[in-house]
């Protein structure tokens, strides 16, 4: 095992973290689950169901018109309640009303085994058989690719596969604890992942928290230590197998890996994931088990501080750095790749001469505030930006939090100007939205770089 030390970055210590024991004893199965278009950029669905249809767990809901063979399946049994579309008929979400029996059973129905399932170990199967089973079951959608951050194309073969067993985002659950006791599923899953590439399979974990997956000729364990983004797949790929046009890498996380292993072992993957529910407004942060795509409208309600209405809280699917607001019947659901739900206080206040305050409770990457010399502790972060958008000033803040070997200020400028050629020269193909979350947080100009990055990536992909 090699140890990789990350020097640049920033850990945001936020109040409201769940207990560190990693136990997720509580199960929450909501009345609705959904598949969200925002999870699959560039995907164009070909619908296989319509509103009112009854579906069982594992039934095909739609396929990707742009990538034939990639199927998106129902996470739980129920009835298709609605299919929502936006401007120019862009797919936004498909909502399933969960069967009462499914809810009473804790979302544990096995569904139907794929026709290609044999119960044999992946080592005894051909590469093509492994791919067909993943596609038929819908588990293929757990695999994402760099560059571009799309669901992997089954017609291609990556240079390497990354199994991510660490997460350094604020309030994130420990991926190793989330799959504790599932050594067999992890071993079968790693064997299946090795069938997807002729190159190495990297198992990336935090130093001292190794994932119990066997090491082999092509399965290599790598340990990372340091501040965020030390626990992101993008940085692991950047360090171990950098991507560019024609050189892909695929990645998936530990819980999806265990689900794939269970699929090959039993004929059915997991409908549930361990999810962290955290944030300063919560009186009882917790680790929960919840289905993929769970409705978040009432998910955090039992744990909010008394006396606060929903308008004063923002529920975020994912990390506070790279997640998205999740509310309402259209998009108020847990994202496919999100393992945490973050709740923050809405802060619309404007502080007169706030920049003159000592900032004893401020969360900042600079040393301009008193908090930088006080003992490190978790702080009550809100949604406030402490100012409006302004011009970029390259004072070194960006480079301080940019762990990639990319000139951060130049990258930010290229993204905002949509200078496609310059962005590609700088290495934008190695990034997706979560990789620029710290740039947004640290930006003195209050810019959000994730949408700008996605526009640049879409243009690069379209132009080939």
Please report, for each region that a protein language model flagged, where it lies by residue:
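Short, solvent-exposed loop/turn positions at domain surfaces
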Residues: 43, 49, 66-69, 284
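Short, well-structured beta-strand-loop connectors
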Residues: 49-63, 81-82
């Amino acid at each position: 095992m090699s140890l990789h030390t990350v020097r640049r970055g920033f850990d945001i210590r936020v109040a409201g973290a769940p207990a560190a024991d990693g136990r997720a004893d509580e199960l929450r199965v909501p009345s609705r689950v959904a598949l969200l278009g925002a999870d699959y950029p560039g995907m164009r669905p070909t619908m296989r169901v319509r509103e009112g249809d009854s579906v069982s767990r594992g039934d095909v809901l739609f396929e990707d018109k742009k990538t034939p063979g990639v199927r998106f399946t129902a996470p739980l049994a129920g009835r298709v309640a609605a299919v929502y579309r936006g401007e120019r008929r862009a797919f936004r979400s498909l909502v399933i009303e969960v069967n009462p029996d499914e809810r009473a059973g804790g979302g544990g129905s096995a569904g139907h085994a794929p026709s290609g399932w044999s119960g044999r170990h992946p080592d005894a199967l051909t590469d093509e058989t492994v791919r067909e089973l993943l596609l038929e079951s819908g588990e293929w959608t757990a695999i994402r690719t760099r560059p571009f951050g799309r669901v992997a194309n089954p017609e291609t073969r990556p240079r390497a596969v990354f199994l991510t067993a660490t997460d350094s985002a604020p309030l994130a659950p420990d991926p190793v604890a989330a799959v504790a006791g599932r050594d067999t599923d992890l071993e079968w899953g790693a064997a299946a992942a090795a069938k997807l590439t002729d190159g190495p399979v990297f198992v990336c974990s935090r130093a001292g928290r190794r994932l119990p997956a066997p090491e082999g000729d092509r399965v290599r364990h790598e340990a990372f230590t340091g501040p965020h983004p030390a626990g992101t797949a993008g940085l692991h790929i950047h360090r171990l197998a950098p991507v560019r046009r024609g050189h892909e890498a695929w990645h998936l996380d530990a819980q999806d890996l265990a689900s794939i292993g269970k699929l090959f072992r039993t004929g059915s993957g997991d409908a549930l994931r361990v999810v962290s529910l955290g944030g300063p407004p919560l009186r009882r942060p917790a680790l929960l088990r919840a289905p993929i795509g769970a409705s978040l409208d009432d998910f955090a309600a039992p744990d909010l501080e008394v006396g606060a209405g929903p308008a004063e809280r923002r529920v975020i699917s994912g990390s506070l750095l790279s997640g998205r607001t999740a509310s309402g019947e259209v998009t108020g659901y847990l994202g496919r790749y999100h393992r945490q739900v973050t709740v923050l206080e809405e802060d619309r206040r404007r502080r007169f001469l706030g920049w003159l305050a000592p900032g004893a409770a401020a969360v900042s990457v600079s040393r301009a505030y008193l908090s930088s010399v006080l003992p490190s502790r978790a702080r009550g972060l809100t949604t406030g930006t402490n100012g409006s958008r302004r011009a970029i000033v390259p004072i070194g803040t960006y480079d301080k939090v940019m762990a990639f070997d990319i000139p951060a200020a130049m990258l930010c400028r290229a993204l905002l100007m949509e200078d496609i050629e310059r962005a590609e020269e700088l290495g934008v193909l190695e990034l997706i939205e979560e990789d620029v979350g710290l740039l947004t947080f640290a930006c003195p100009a209050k810019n959000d770089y994730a949408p700008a990055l996605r526009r640049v990536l879409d243009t690069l992909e379209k132009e080939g």
